[in-house]
From Swiss-Prot:
GO cellular component: ribonucleoprotein complex; ribosome
Gene3D superfamilies per record: 2.30.30.30
NCBIfam families assigned: rplX_bact (TIGR01079)
Gene behind the chain: rplX
Keywords: Ribonucleoprotein, Ribosomal protein, RNA-binding, rRNA-binding
Lineage summary: Bacteria, Bacillati, Bacillota, Bacilli, Lactobacillales
Name the record gives this protein: Large ribosomal subunit protein uL24
Length: 101
């Protein structure tokens, strides 16, 4: 999976298209990511001893990894490629050529 936790990304599809934010969690088994402030859903919580009234909580839902592009240090969004630098495999931005790792 080309996106990692902590990467700054731009959403390229969906209702939050154009938003730039940080990846909170990567879910490689299902090829999805949770991005801060993107795809907000309302989750109903049952009443419990901590919250006897119950609640409606807003949280981020996972979005497919193909709907985001990783930003480099200069804020250029592009596809991610892999190459070897000094015998170490690193990710790089294919548009700008800048190393991401």
């Amino acid at each position: 999976m080309f996106v990692k936790k902590g990467d700054k990304v731009r959403v390229i599809a969906g209702k939050d298209k154009g938003v730039e934010a940080v990846v909170l969690k990567a879910l490689p088994k299902v090829n999805k990511v949770i991005v801060e402030g993107v795809a907000i859903i309302k989750k109903h919580q049952k009443p419990n001893s901590e919250n006897p009234q119950g609640a409606i909580v807003e949280k981020e839902a996972p979005i497919h990894a193909s709907n985001v592009q990783v930003l480099d240090k200069n804020g250029v969004a592009g596809r991610v490629g892999y190459k070897f630098v000094d015998g170490k495999k690193v990710r790089y931005n294919k548009k700008s050529g800048e190393v991401l790792d």
